[in-house]
C-alpha cells in the first residue's frame, strides 16, 4: 500500500521497501507546492532520504537537509518530465547523464571520515533554453542569490571573480546559437557532522578556443584577479609542464571544466579536469603521480592496480603497459575511454592533489558488478568500518535489482583519490528520470501515463 502525500500517493521505490520515517513525516507536514515540485520532491527527496538514512546521518541532520532540499533545491528543477526526451538537456553528469538536472554522489569514507553525500544540480528557469539565456546563466544566478540569504558560510567571491574569465560571452547571434548550452553547474555538499551546507561551482566555457587556453592564460589571469598579482602558481605550472612536456601528460585532453569551492578564498580548491584515451595502468599511475613528482607508495599503487583490474575484469597477470581490451560488441563513443582526472591547483599547494574518475558504463559489465567490486575491495582492505554495503540499498531505491544486475546506466563514475595510504572512493550516480521515464511514472503515481498525454 502506498503512503499518502497530502492526499496524493507518495509512490513506492523500485526495489527497496524499507521505510523512510523522516521523509514520510515531512511529506505529511510540508506544503504541497506545485505539481512539478511534488514530482521532483517525491522522486529526489526520497532518494536523498534513503542516502542519508543508509549513511547513518543523525536524525536532526536528515530533517535539516531534506527541508533545505525541498524549499531551496526542488523549485529549481523546472517542469516535470512529460516524455523520455528531456525538454532541456542538462550537463549534469556529462555524457553519463540522461538530461535530468540532478545527480548524486556517495563518498564511502575513510578511517577518519564518515560517508557523506553530495547533489549536483543545474537550476532551470523560465528563460532556460531560450535565446534570452542560451547558456542557462540566469537561473543559476538567481539560485545563488537566494542561497546568500540562507547559508551563512557561503562565500561566492572566488566564483564571481572566476566566472567572467571562464564563461563564454558571444556578441554575434550565430555564435550564441552555435555554442548554446549549459555553462555552470552547482554542487551541494551535505556533510553528516556539520550544520553547514557547502556549495561547489563548476564552470565550463562553451568556446573550444577557450578550453585550449585555460592553463596557459585564462586560469592564471583569474587567479591573479582573485589572489593578487603575486599569487603562487607553482601547482598550476607543474600541471602545465606535465601536460606540455611529459609523454603521458601530452596524452591528456582538457575537458574544459574548472571547479571551485564557495568558501573562504584561501581555503578553496581550484580543480582542473582532463581525460585520456590511454587505459594502460602504467599511464594511469603516471598521471596520478604527475610523472613521479607526487610519488605514491608501492602499496597504494598495488591497490590502484587491483581496483582497476577488477573493475575491468582483467586477470592479475595482465601487463600493466597494455590497453584495456574493448569488450566484444561494446560500443564506445569517440574520444576518451572513460578515464578522467582532476588536478587541484590552488595556490597554497606546493604539489597538486589528483583524483581519477572511472566511467562505469565503459569499464564494468553492470552497475551491480561495479558496486560489488568496489565494496568488496573496501572490505578486503580494512575499509569496511562504515558499512559500504549500505550503498547497495541506495542503488536499489533508484533501480530494480534485475536492472542493476544486467545493465549499466544508474552509475556514472567512481572517483579515486589517495588519503593517508587509503583509497578514498566516491560513487556518482543519477536518478534515471528520463532513462526510466515510464517506470518512474508507475513508481510515483501507481499507474502509467497515457501515451497520448
Swiss-Prot record:
Keywords: Prenyltransferase, Transferase. The keyword Cell membrane does not apply. The keyword Transferase applies. GO terms for molecular function: prenyltransferase activity. Dimethylallyl diphosphate binds at residues 118, 200, 202, 271, 273, 428. InterPro entries: Aro_prenylTrfase (IPR033964), Aro_prenylTrfase_DMATS (IPR017795), DMATS-type_fun (IPR012148). One of its GO terms (biological process) is alkaloid metabolic process. Transmembrane segments: none annotated. It is an enzyme of class 2 (transferase). Pathway: Secondary metabolite biosynthesis. Its EC number is 2.5.1.-. It holds the Pfam family Trp_DMAT. Prenyltransferase; part of the gene cluster that mediates the biosynthesis of neosartoricin, a prenylated anthracenone that exhibits T-cell antiproliferative activity, suggestive of a physiological role as an immunosuppressive agent. The non-reducing polyketide synthase nscA probably synthesizes and cyclizes the decaketide backbone. The hydrolase nscB then mediates the product release through hydrolysis followed by spontaneous decarboxylation. The prenyltransferase nscD catalyzes the addition of the dimethylallyl group to the aromatic C5. Belongs to the tryptophan dimethylallyltransferase family. NCBIfam families: arom_pren_DMATS. This is Prenyltransferase nscD.
Amino acid at each position: 500500500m502506498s503512503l499518502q502525500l497530502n492526499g496524493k500517493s507518495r509512490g513506492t521505490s523500485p526495489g527497496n521497501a524499507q521505510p523512510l520515517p523522516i521523509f514520510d513525516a515531512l511529506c505529511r507536514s510540508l506544503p504541497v507546492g506545485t505539481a512539478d515540485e511534488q514530482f521532483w520532491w517525491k522522486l529526489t527527496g526520497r532518494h536523498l532520504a534513503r542516502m542519508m538514512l543508509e549513511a547513518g546521518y543523525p536524525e536532526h541532520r536528515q530533517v535539516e537537509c531534506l527541508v533545505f532540499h525541498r524549499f531551496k533545491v526542488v523549485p529549481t528543477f523546472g517542469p516535470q518530465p512529460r516524455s523520455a526526451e528531456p525538454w532541456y538537456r542538462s550537463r549534469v553528469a556529462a555524457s553519463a547523464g540522461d538530461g535530468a538536472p540532478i545527480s548524486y554522489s556517495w563518498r564511502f569514507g575513510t578511517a577518519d571520515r564518515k560517508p557523506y553525500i553530495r547533489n549536483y544540480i543545474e537550476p532551470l528557469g523560465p528563460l532556460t533554453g531560450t535565446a534570452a539565456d542560451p547558456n542557462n546563466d540566469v537561473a543559476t544566478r538567481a539560485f545563488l542569490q537566494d542561497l546568500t540569504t540562507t547559508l551563512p558560510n557561503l562565500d561566492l567571491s572566488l566564483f564571481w571573480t572566476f566566472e567572467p574569465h571562464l564563461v563564454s560571452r558571444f556578441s554575434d547571434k550565430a555564435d550564441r546559437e552555435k555554442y548554446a548550452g549549459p555553462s555552470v553547474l552547482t554542487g551541494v555538499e551535505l556533510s553528516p557532522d556539520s550544520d553547514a551546507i557547502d556549495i561547489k561551482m563548476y564552470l565550463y566555457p562553451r568556446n573550444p578556443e577557450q578550453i585550449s587556453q585555460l592553463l596557459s592564460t585564462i586560469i592564471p589571469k583569474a587567479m591573479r584577479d582573485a589572489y593578487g598579482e603575486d599569487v603562487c602558481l607553482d601547482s598550476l605550472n607543474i600541471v602545465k609542464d606535465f601536460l606540455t612536456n611529459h609523454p603521458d601528460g601530452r596524452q591528456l585532453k582538457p575537458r574544459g571544466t574548472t571547479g571551485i569551492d564557495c568558501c573562504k578564498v584561501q581555503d578553496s580548491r581550484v580543480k582542473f579536469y582532463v581525460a585520456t584515451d590511454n587505459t594502460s595502468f602504467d599511464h594511469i599511475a603516471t598521471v596520478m603521480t604527475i610523472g613521479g613528482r607526487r610519488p605514491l607508495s608501492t602499496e597504494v599503487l598495488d591497490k590502484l592496480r587491483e581496483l582497476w583490474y577488477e573493475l575491468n575484469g582483467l586477470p592479475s597477470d595482465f601487463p600493466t603497459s597494455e590497453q584495456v581490451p574493448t569488450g566484444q560488441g561494446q560500443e564506445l563513443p569517440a574520444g576518451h575511454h572513460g578515464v578522467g582526472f582532476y588536478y587541484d591547483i590552488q595556490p597554497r599547494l606546493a604539489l597538486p592533489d589528483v583524483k581519477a574518475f572511472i566511467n562505469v558504463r565503459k569499464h564494468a559489465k553492470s552497475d551491480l558488478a561495479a558496486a560489488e567490486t568496489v565494496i568488496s575491495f573496501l572490505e578486503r582492505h580494512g575499509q569496511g568500518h562504515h558499512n559500504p554495503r549500505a550503498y547497495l540499498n541506495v542503488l536499489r531505491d533508484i533501480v530494480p535489482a534485475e536492472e542493476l544486475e544486467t545493465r549499466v546506466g544508474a552509475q556514472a563514475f567512481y572517483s579515486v583519490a589517495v588519503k593517508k595510504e587509503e583509497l578514498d572512493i566516491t560513487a556518482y550516480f543519477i536518478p534515471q528520470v528520463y532513462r526510466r521515464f515510464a517506470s518512474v511514472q508507475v513508481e510515483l503515481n501507481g499507474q502509467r501515463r497515457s501515451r497520448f498525454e
